[in-house]
């Protein structure tokens, strides 16, 4: 089973994360940031990755450190669960609509972290969460997971719908990319023979 657990403690946050890439989309998420919890639940449900997150952070300041560090911890857990990445499909992509909003995500689990983020919001906050923090979460996740990640909002008016379609599209792309290719189950999906992160 491809599982991993991560504990991350800093002066700003204390976070425990567990993932099972071969799960069924079960989740138990508590970050202290209601909207972030909602998005992480969508990530789990639509990727079929079981996800546990218990985070305590300096929310008396703002949600920045908690959001970023949760992204790091989930990314680290996914990276660890992937191991040498042998047999994975590696690539995934998805178009996900939510009412008037449509998002496109393309993902490569290449161990070459990079984020392209083409998402704009009309509001400063969703609930208590600053909308600028969503990019911080995706950046932290991509870096820690070793993922090349392109996220593009094609159109949409409702900011809730836009960001939710971003997380759901990531979920669907991740589900596709982590799948084991039965034709290449014993091979690393790279002509270099490794996805160890070196250029």
UniProtKB/Swiss-Prot annotation:
Localization per record: Cytoplasm
UniProt GO cellular component terms: cytoplasm
SUPFAM superfamilies in the cross-refs: Ribosomal protein S5 domain 2-like
Keywords: Amino-acid biosynthesis, Cytoplasm, Histidine biosynthesis, Lyase
Catalytic activity: D-erythro-1-(imidazol-4-yl)glycerol 3-phosphate = 3-(imidazol-4-yl)-2-oxopropyl phosphate + H2O
Coiled coil region boundaries: none
Upper lineage: Bacteria, Pseudomonadati, Pseudomonadota, Alphaproteobacteria, Rhodospirillales
Main subcellular localisation: cytoplasm
Swiss-Prot/TrEMBL GO biological process terms: L-histidine biosynthetic process
GO terms for MF: imidazoleglycerol-phosphate dehydratase activity
Family under the similarity heading: Belongs to the imidazoleglycerol-phosphate dehydratase family.
Record protein name field: Imidazoleglycerol-phosphate dehydratase
E.C. no: 4.2.1.19
HAMAP family for this protein: HisB
Pathway terms, separated by semicolons: Amino-acid biosynthesis; L-histidine biosynthesis; L-histidine from 5-phospho-alpha-D-ribose 1-diphosphate: step 6/9
């Amino acid at each position: 089973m491809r599982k991993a657990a991560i504990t991350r403690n800093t002066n700003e946050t204390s976070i425990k994360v567990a993932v099972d890439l071969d799960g069924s989309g079960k989740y138990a998420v508590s970050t202290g940031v209601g909207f972030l919890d909602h998005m992480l639940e969508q990530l789990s449900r639509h990727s079929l990755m079981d996800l546990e997150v218990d985070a305590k952070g300096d929310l008396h300041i703002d949600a920045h450190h908690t959001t970023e560090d949760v992204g790091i911890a989930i990314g680290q857990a996914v990276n660890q669960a992937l191991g040498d990445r042998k047999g994975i499909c590696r690539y995934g992509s998805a178009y996900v609509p939510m009412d008037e909003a449509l998002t496109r995500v393309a993902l490569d689990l290449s161990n070459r972290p990079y984020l392209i983020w083409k998402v704009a919001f009309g509001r400063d906050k969703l609930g208590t969460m600053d909308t600028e923090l969503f990019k911080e979460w995706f950046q932290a996740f991509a870096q820690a997971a070793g993922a090349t990640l392109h996220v593009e909002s094609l159109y949409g008016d409702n900011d809730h719908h836009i960001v939710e379609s971003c997380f759901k599209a990531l979920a669907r792309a991740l589900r596709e990319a982590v799948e084991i290719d039965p034709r290449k189950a014993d091979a690393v999906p790279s002509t270099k023979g490794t996805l160890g992160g070196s250029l």
